[in-house]
């Protein structure tokens, strides 16, 4: 199963200078709890923005450079230069989950393939340079979990 997970403001802001514009401990804890011991797909810049310790996950790191030398952060990392075979393998096996974790171009290319979306909506306004516009017409809002500084919206793909 393919699951995209990200945080954004109500205006669609997802980043600033390759980092999160906010530091909300509860939201980071939600991301950690959701993705721990899971397989993640992310781009090189997203990987480089992770904390020094980011362990107990399998990371498929998308890079044009197949020989990319990544900094070890405590997770198993596999460098790939084409994510479509990976996407297809997880679509064919609904018993295993692959979490799409960014950045912007990875989300834009994969969201329509996802079975579920987990979107943290940050309540406060922030400044930044990366915005994500998502067409949610193919998804149904399944659940909203409210926190003080953000809400987590859980979407599932509409049945065809």
Swiss-Prot record:
PANTHER family: DIHYDROFOLATE REDUCTASE. Coiled coil: none annotated. This is Dihydrofolate reductase. GO terms for biological process: dihydrofolate metabolic process; folic acid metabolic process; one-carbon metabolic process; tetrahydrofolate biosynthetic process. It comes from Mycoplasma genitalium (strain ATCC 33530 / DSM 19775 / NCTC 10195 / G37) (Mycoplasmoides genitalium). NADP(+) binds at residues 6-7, 14-19, 43-46, 62-65, 101-106. Belongs to the dihydrofolate reductase family. Key enzyme in folate metabolism. Catalyzes an essential reaction for de novo glycine and purine synthesis, and for DNA precursor synthesis. Keywords: NADP, One-carbon metabolism, Oxidoreductase. Pfam families: DHFR_1 (PF00186). It comes from the Bacteria. The lineage of its organism: Bacteria, Bacillati, Mycoplasmatota, Mycoplasmoidales, Mycoplasmoidaceae. One of its GO terms (molecular function) is NADP binding.
